[in-house]
Every structure is written in structure tokens, then in C-alpha cells.
Amino acid sequence: MLMQSIYLSKIREQNPLIHNITNIVAANFSANGLLALGASPLMSANIEEMQEVPKISQVLVINIGTLIGKDREAMLQAGKTANEVGIPVVLDPVGVGATSYRRETIRQLLAEVKFALIRGNAGELAAIAGETWQAKGVDAGQGEVDLKAVAEKVAQRYGCTVLISGAVDIVSDGTQTATVHNGTSLFPKVTASGCLLSAVCAAFLAVSEGNYFSATLEACVAYTIAGECAAQGLTTQVGQFQIRLLDELAALSPETIGQRGRINE
């Protein structure tokens, strides 16, 4: 099933400000990816700013990849402020199943902050759903659960949209579920490629006027198409892929999304 692009042009017209509390591995890549797409990144995790920055932003991304110092407190404060001013909040629960500190951080965030989108790999979402899964650090790992059911369960439990990234991506808001069949095997070879996807989703949510399911679906299709285009002619050249991915995000058009997107609903 093909899709019509609704939000990409709006991102480039509106240049939304994306507040990222992200990890030290992903910060540069996420910022450059957002710039390439047409959004404006703001990369701040200073707890002293968390009552102000969300008030000038259009969306907040909380990524727990490298929890340092007062990061958890900053995330909670920023999330609560974002909820107060009514901007969407995206959660990337990096490696939530790896340590008790990460699990407790996510438990507290989900209890105290309302999220518009939770984006993670299969292992991360299985952990949030309480399903048995053999995660490998921050990587997806292996398991035998129904991932569509996991996406729907988490979406219903927290009243949000869920995106599970993998060879086939799954998007659900608990009542409607779609799968995205674009992408490339080079994505897992580049660190922070999933973190950038969360940031890209945030840019789409920022201009979606509350239509978070359709915005997440288009964001996922757009990003995975950019990956396909970047990977053309490459096999193991992951360094070239990373740079070309930024170029393809900048070159992406609504027409390309409509022509190349492969989704099942």
C-alpha cells in the first residue's frame, strides 16, 4: 500500500524547534539529521533550563542512552513542563532491559510524564510490556513474542503511539496498526541510527496537530526510504552510508515518499 506525504513539506515550511535530551553517542548525528530534514535541533540536558526550554520548543525527545549525573531529574522536569505547555513528548527507552537503573528510570518517566510516542527496538518495547526477551545491551537481542501485540499492548497501556523498529517496523496506537517494509540492513551497523529515527519522528509530530499515528507512520517511511537511497551501491561501507543518509534526508521529497513507501495496514 502506498501513502501520501502530508507532513514533510510542513517541516520544511515551519522549521520546528526540536528539544533533544539525548545521549552523548547520538547528539551530533541527531542534530545533523534534523537539520538535513528541515527541522531545528536544540540539544540541552541542563536541569537548570528544563522549565524554560520546552516552552520555546515544538516537541521534546527524551533518550536514556547514556544516563549521566542529573539526567533523570532533567528528563522528568522537561517532560512535566512539556506536558504543561501541551507539546508532544517522544520517549526512546534505549537499553531499558539492560540494567535496573534504566528500568527504574523508564518506570518513573512513564508514571510521571505523558508521552505521545514511544520508539524503540523489539527488546526495549518487550521490556516495557513485561514480555520475556533476551536483550543484548542496547541492541534488540532475540525473543519469541508477537511484536504487533506488544506494540498494541504498550500503546493501549500508556495511551500513546508506539513504533517498534526492526527489519519490519511496526506502528500502533492501540486501535490501528501498520507495518513498514522499507529500510536497509546497514541501519544496525551505524550507532545512533535508531536515536536519529526518534528525533525524525519528533519533527513529524511537531507539525502533526495531534495526529501522532499518521505522523509517526510517515516519519518511519521517510526515514527508511532515505536509508534505502543512501545504501544504494554500498555493501560494507558504513562510513559512507552515515554521510549519505544525511544527504538523502535533505534530498527527500513528498513524491519519493509516495512512490517508494511500502506499508501494510
Swiss-Prot record:
Belongs to the Thz kinase family. InterPro entries: Hyethyz_kinase (IPR000417), Ribokinase-like (IPR029056). Pfam families: HK. This is Hydroxyethylthiazole kinase. GO terms for biological process: thiamine biosynthetic process; thiamine diphosphate biosynthetic process. ATP binds at R119, S165. Substrate binds at M43, A192. The gene is thiM.
